[in-house]
């Protein structure tokens, strides 16, 4: 049992012990959250280490398997994989521990709320005794003053009337003083009783909290200890495996797996050369009865190149240039003495003679030399041109042997290359834009001097189709990520094709395709402050700030089924400071802290403040508001940095926080969509139904600048639409633009877009359409902003929401 430390040590003259103990209890929630964050960070580190070890184990299997050391890599791989698994097991245990800490944190919040209600009486007693103490002190001072005044009048010989009047006041002050003394006694007794009970309650809560936290830490240390024991076992196993992998065993494995045989070469003795038998043995090998002369010659050439026998090498006769020749007498004797000779063998023997006669005239001027010089031989060898043997290779081998330079050259004498080039150029460049923009194609990057640019290719082949079309035809939902965002600013370069979306030119003036572009678009609006001139700000003025709340709604509609609608709504808050405020901040070492409150946050799933500039109280219990305060030192440094980058700016924007709004499917979309396609070989009918949905907004607001773009393929030759649309033949897209939609619109904001397309290369394939709109003056979540405290005033607050990726499919 722990001693009653809280009961004995939290009294004091100002009776502020209750406040200290209550805030200490609230700090327990912060400790629990920070412990969960610490364990989560440790789990992240362990997971990253496990992945790195797994990658290392895989790389070990890719190392060289040659040599006697190769089997050792298997030992490394096995050990590394086991280490990775150990750390992965620790990650699982830490994740379970995080869930336990989070569950305890939720229970802790509920317990603290209940305790707050229970100690409400003590809080009243504290406030009562504090107020009575102050009143008692004042009544005592008044009583002393009246008594002194009465005695002074008596001593100075004042009139009886003045003395009586002073006596009445003194008696009244005495009664008041006695009354507060009695009240203080009662309040003191009540305060001591309740404070004793409350202090003990707070101590019990802290004891329970610390015991639970220590149990969690014990579980953490045990998990780490178990994993370290497993890691130790893995290391022991690795040491044993390496001890068993001896040098002898490695050499033995290599000898058994890579050995070439155990038979040693036999003994060879010197044998005398029998010239007669050697010459006789040549003819039977050459002679083939009923054989064709050409075939026999090829076989004889192959034999002379691939396996020259020792007998032929022993012929000593050479000509004047050093070439070996056969004696004519031997050849004649062979013809006469052997019945194998025939017209076939004669033709075979005559062909080498012809080659000998043709070789000699190659050096007519150098007949007096006995041997060609080394330089002349090099020149002769260098001038030899091999016959075109590429025709014998398969097409795959030919392409593999060709260099990148050969692929890019255009030679009239190389028909195969020209054919290959024409085949490549004839391909439909479905993925051309992505390759050109990324510049990551292997053929493009392999040669920096490639003469054929994407623009020249485009002059040969038909215009490229949109890069999104192949993706959408194979799978609608997977194609969302592939379709280019039609409302974002076009990013063009010298080598990339023109933008695929027809809205790309119009959107530079109204870029609202993402939350980032919304923030950029808001910058001029937020900068227009109604506050004082930036240069006239003084240290004593209330400093003006402006705020922009911007939300982006992303949606994907699948046909007319509302259950398949996917919605995500995000928002961000930007704060704008006048440039003159920087001088105020830098001249004042302790500027007033800027505190603000975000209201109506019940519909928010997550709030992410700028961790470098903004602080918040995680123990705040109000579910509809949240208070924040800014790190003024960090804000000053950040504003000074912005000022150095752009000294001429009148205002500087700071990203304060981002948030995500909870969504309820199609009910959270301000404009519901449904698309219908009817495709035939000659025509395509399209209908897009839209409906204004005020329930998605806290306060119904007007949707303005509505733009709809639909890609249509199949070779559109004519378009009929209602309301009128614009057809971009180059981009193959239809484009509608509506001024505004609201509850006051026709049919309550419901309507249809219809179009009929005549085709020359039908049928068309249904594609994904994109929609853009915006609304000024309100947000979907209803989030609001207000300043808390003094020193600052809100000069302007700007609210808007707009579309991010707002897509519809059939």
Curated annotation (Swiss-Prot):
Primary localisation category: membrane
MF GO annotations: identical protein binding; phosphatidylinositol binding; phosphatidylinositol-4,5-bisphosphate binding; phosphatidylserine binding
Modified residues (Phosphothreonine): 385
Record's protein name: F-BAR domain only protein 2
Domain MHD: 542-809
Annotated stretches, region: Mediates interaction with DAB2, EPS15, EPS15R and ITSN1: 521-810
Localization of this protein: Membrane, Clathrin-coated pit
Entry keywords, A to Z: Coated pit, Coiled coil, Disulfide bond, Endocytosis, Isopeptide bond, Membrane, Phosphoprotein, Ubl conjugation
Organism: Homo sapiens
Family from the record: Belongs to the FCHO family.
Linked residues for Glycyl lysine isopeptide (Lys-Gly) (interchain with G-Cter in SUMO2): 297
SMART domains given in the database record: FCH (SM00055)
Biased composition (Low complexity): 433-456, 502-521
Gene Ontology CC annotations of this record: clathrin-coated pit; clathrin-coated vesicle; cytoplasm; cytosol; plasma membrane; presynapse
Subunit structure: Homodimer; disulfide-linked. May form homotetramer. Interacts with AP2A1. Interacts with EPS15, EPS15R, ITSN1 and ITSN2; recruit those scaffolding proteins which in turn may interact with the adaptor protein complex AP-2 at the plasma membrane. Interacts with DAB2 (via DPF motifs); mediates LDL receptor/LDLR endocytosis.
Region named Mediates dimerization and binding to membranes enriched in Pi(4,5)-P2 and induces their tubulation: 3-274
Phosphoserine, modified sites: 312, 387, 394, 403, 488, 493, 496, 508, 510-511, 533
């Amino acid at each position: 049992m722990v001693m009653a430390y809280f009961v004995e040590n939290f009294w004091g003259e100002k009776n502020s012990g209750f406040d200290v103990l209550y805030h200490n209890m609230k700090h327990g929630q912060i400790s629990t959250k920070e412990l969960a964050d610490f364990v989560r960070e440790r789990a992240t580190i362990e997971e990253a280490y496990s992945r790195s070890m797994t990658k290392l184990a895989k790389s070990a299997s890719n190392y060289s398997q040659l040599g006697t050391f190769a089997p050792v890599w298997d030992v490394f791989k096995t050990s590394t994989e086991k280490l990775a698994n150990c750390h992965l097991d620790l990650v699982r245990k830490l994740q379970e521990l995080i869930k336990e800490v989070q569950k305890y944190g939720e229970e802790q919040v509920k317990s603290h709320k209940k305790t707050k209600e229970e100690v409400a009486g003590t809080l009243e007693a504290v406030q009562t005794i504090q107020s009575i103490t102050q009143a008692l002190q004042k009544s005592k001072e008044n009583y002393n003053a009246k008594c002194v005044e009465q005695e002074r009048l008596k001593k100075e010989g004042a009139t009886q009337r003045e003395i009586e009047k002073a006596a009445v006041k003194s008696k009244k002050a005495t009664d008041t003083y006695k009354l507060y003394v009695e009240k203080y006694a009662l309040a003191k007794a009540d305060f001591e009783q309740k404070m004793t009970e409350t202090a003990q309650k707070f101590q019990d809560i802290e004891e329970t909290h610390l015991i639970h936290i220590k149990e969690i830490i014990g579980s953490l240390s045990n998990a780490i200890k178990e994993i370290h024991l497993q890691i130790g076992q893995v290391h022991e196993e690795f040491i044993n495996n390496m001890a068993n992998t001896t040098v002898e065993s490695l050499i033995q494995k290599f000898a058994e797996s890579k050995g070439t045989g155990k038979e040693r070469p036999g003994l060879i003795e010197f044998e005398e050369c029998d010239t007669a038998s050697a010459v006789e043995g040549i003819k039977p090998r050459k002679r083939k009865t009923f054989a064709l002369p050409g075939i026999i010659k090829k076989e004889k050439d192959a034999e002379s190149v691939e396996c020259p026998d020792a007998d032929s090498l022993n012929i000593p006769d050479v000509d004047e240039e050093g070439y070996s020749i056969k004696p004519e007498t031997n050849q004649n004797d062979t013809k006469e003495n052997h019945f194998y000779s025939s017209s076939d063998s004669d033709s075979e023997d005559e062909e080498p003679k012809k080659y000998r006669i043709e070789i000699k005239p190659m050096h007519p001027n150098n007949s007096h030399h006995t041997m060609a010089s080394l330089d002349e031989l090099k020149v002769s060898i260098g001038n030899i041109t091999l016959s075109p043997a590429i025709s014998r290779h398969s097409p795959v081998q030919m392409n593999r042997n060709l260099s990148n330079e050969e692929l890019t050259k255009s030679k009239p004498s190389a028909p195969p290359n020209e054919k290959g080039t024409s085949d490549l150029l004839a391909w439909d460049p479905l993925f051309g834009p992505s390759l050109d923009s990324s510049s990551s194609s292997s053929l493009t990057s392999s040669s920096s001097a490639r003469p054929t640019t994407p623009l020249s290719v485009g002059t040969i082949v038909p215009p490229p189709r949109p890069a999104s079309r192949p993706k959408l035809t194979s799978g609608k939902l997977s194609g969302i990520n592939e379709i280019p965002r039609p409302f974002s600013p076009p990013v063009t370069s010298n080598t990339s094709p023109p933008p695929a979306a027809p809205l790309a030119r119009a959107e530079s003036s109204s870029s609202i395709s993402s939350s980032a572009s919304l923030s950029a678009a808001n910058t001029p609006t937020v900068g227009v402050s109604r506050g004082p001139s930036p240069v006239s700000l003084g240290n004593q003025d209330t400093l003006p700030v402006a705020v922009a709340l911007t939300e982006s709604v992303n949606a994907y509609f699948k046909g007319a089924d509302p259950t398949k609608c996917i919605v995500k709504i995000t928002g961000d808050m930007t704060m704008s400071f006048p440039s003159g405020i920087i001088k105020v901040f830098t001249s004042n070492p302790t500027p007033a802290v800027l505190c603000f409150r975000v209201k109506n946050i019940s519909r928010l799933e997550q709030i992410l403040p700028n961790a470098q500039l903004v602080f918040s109280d995680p123990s705040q219990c109000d579910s509809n508001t949240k208070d924040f305060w800014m790190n003024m030192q960090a804000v000053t440094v950040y504003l000074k940095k912005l000022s150095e980058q752009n000294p001429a700016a009148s205002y500087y924007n700071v990203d304060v926080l981002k948030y995500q709004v909870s969504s309820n499917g199609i009910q959270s979309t301000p404009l519901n969509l449904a698309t219908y396609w009817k495709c035939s070989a000659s025509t395509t009918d399209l209908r897009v139904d839209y409906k204004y949905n005020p329930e998605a907004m806290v306060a119904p607001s007007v949707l303005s600048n509505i733009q709809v773009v639909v890609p249509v393929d199949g070779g559109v030759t004519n378009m009929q639409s209602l309301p009128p649309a614009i057809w971009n033949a180059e981009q193959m897209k239809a484009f509608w633009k509506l001024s505004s939609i609201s509850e006051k619109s026709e049919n309550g904001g419901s309507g249809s877009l219809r179009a009929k397309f005549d085709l020359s290369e039908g049928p068309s394939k249904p594609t994904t359409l994109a929609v853009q709109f915006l609304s000024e003056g309100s947000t979907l979540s209803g989030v609001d902003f207000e300043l808390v405290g003094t020193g600052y005033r809100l000069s302007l607050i700007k609210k808007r929401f707009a579309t991010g990726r707002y897509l519809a499919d059939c």
